[in-house]
């Protein structure tokens, strides 16, 4: 009996000692499996676009969350008056990427601070903002702030270039332009149709100034770009950096270099809610990482996680539009998302040939910066955007 008891305790001691000695197995997080060889297919695409004279050159950056996977520049930054090679730190006219990056983000910061809410009427900030007038001569509902952000306010897309001097004269201010926009006939009742409108984002920049006393330039610098360390992102690039700016169109013998391409932003002195922002591929990658990190980058929080979610999902009241709050998800303008990224992916394009697309599911972002309008506004990047997005998406060998 004693032998059995002794044997029993020996077994217990052995088991206990083994438990003490055995350490838990440390499992390293699996690194993303990316086919770098597959990403190199982008080189052939860009070269073909340059041979077709669709673009003079390009900068491409692809990343996954906090890691840059691919970064390359191609061709020339300009062709006239003299060819000049593209460089990694070149500054591009982002055109309509201004809308989500500067304007919509600024509005959402104000929402978080309780200084505005999205269902407020536009006319509360822009007196005289005329509602839709139907065939019976009756005015409809008032447009709300969210209608401006989703391009469903009923505002027309633009003001024809040839009408700008006629409507505003030689001296244009944001105040008199917004007064003119407010009085324009609306194309539809708010929330009933989607018409991509630069005018709505000009109104949003006016609203930012009404609330804060700052232009969209001043507010976005102070609350977005400086905190993030995006030190080559700005409206109206400083004189000492204009040599790094990629030129756009040549208009009346003037090559627009460091001067915004968009006509309405240009007559507003380069500062507008619809266009005017300049940046680099590396600076835009910081912004993309901030969104993928749910509003935070390097310990600096710009937006709350819920704000990022609301901005980057199709807005519930106008699901037909395929638009979020400033961002594009599934609209006629979303070609830069390609065919493979999921339904939660979002982004935006710019008329000058720029685009940013982000996929929260795979944590991949795709930045394509070109100056396809240089020198004569004949280039095209619609197909190129989609193909690069498809290569980026299919380079991921293991879904995260």
Go through the PLM ranges and name each one.
Residues 1-4:
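Positively charged n-region of N-terminal signal peptides that target proteins for export
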Residues 7-15:
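Bacterial N-terminal signal peptides
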Residues 15-28:
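Bacterial Sec-dependent signal peptides at the C-terminal "C-region" and cleavage site
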Residues 31-92, 115, 131-132, 182-183, ...:
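Short, conserved catalytic-motif segment at the N-terminal edge
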Residues 46, 60, 66, 93-119, ...:
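Active-site SXXK
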Residues 78, 133-344:
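Short, surface-exposed loop or secondary-structure junction motifs
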Residues 118-134, 226-228:
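Short, glycine/proline-biased beta-turn/loop segments that scaffold the active-site neighborhood
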Residues 345, 352-365:
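Short, surface-exposed beta-strand/loop micro-motifs that present aromatic residues
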């Amino acid at each position: 009996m004693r032998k059995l008891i002794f044997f029993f305790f020996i077994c217990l001691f052995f088991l206990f000692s083994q438990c003490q000695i055995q350490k838990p197995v440390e499992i390293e997080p699996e690194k993303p499996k990316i086919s770098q060889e597959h990403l190199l297919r982008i080189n052939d695409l860009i070269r073909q676009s340059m041979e077709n004279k669709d673009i003079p050159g390009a900068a491409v950056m692809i990343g996954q969350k906090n890691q840059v996977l691919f970064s390359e520049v191609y061709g020339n930054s300009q062709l006239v008056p003299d060819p000049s090679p593209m460089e990694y730190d070149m500054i591009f006219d982002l055109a309509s990427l201004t809308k989500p990056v500067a304007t919509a983000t600024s509005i959402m910061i104000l929402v978080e601070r309780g200084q505005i809410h999205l269902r407020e009427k536009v006319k509360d900030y822009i007196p005289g903002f005329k509602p839709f007038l139907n065939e019976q001569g009756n005015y409809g509902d008032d447009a709300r702030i969210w209608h401006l952000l989703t391009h469903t306010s009923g505002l027309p897309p633009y003001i024809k270039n040839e009408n700008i001097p006629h409507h505003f004269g030689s001296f244009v201010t944001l105040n008199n332009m917004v007064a003119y926009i407010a009085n324009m006939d609306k194309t539809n009742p708010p929330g009933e149709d989607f018409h991509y409108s630069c005018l709505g984002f000009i109104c949003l920049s006016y609203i930012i100034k009404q609330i804060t006393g700052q232009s969209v330039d001043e507010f976005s610098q102070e609350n977005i770009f400086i905190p993030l360390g995006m030190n080559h992102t700005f409206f109206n690039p400083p004189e000492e950096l204009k040599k790094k700016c990629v030129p756009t169109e040549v208009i009346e013998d003037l090559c627009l270099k460091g001067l915004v391409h968009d006509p309405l932003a240009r007559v507003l002195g380069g500062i507008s809610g619809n266009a005017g922002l300049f940046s680099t591929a590396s600076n835009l990658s910081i912004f993309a990482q901030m969104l993928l990190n749910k509003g935070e980058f390097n310990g600096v929080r710009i937006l709350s996680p819920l704000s990022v979610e609301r901005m980057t999902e199709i807005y519930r009241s106008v699901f037909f539009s395929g638009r979020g709050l400033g961002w594009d998800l599934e609209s006629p303008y979303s070609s830069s998302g390609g065919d493979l990224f999921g339904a939660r992916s979002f982004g935006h394009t710019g008329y000058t040939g720029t685009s940013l697309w982000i996929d929260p599911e795979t944590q991949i972002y795709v930045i394509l910066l070109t100056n396809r309008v240089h020198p004569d506004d004949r280039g095209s990047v619609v197909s190129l955007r989609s193909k690069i997005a498809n290569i980026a998406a299919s380079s991921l060998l293991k879904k995260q």
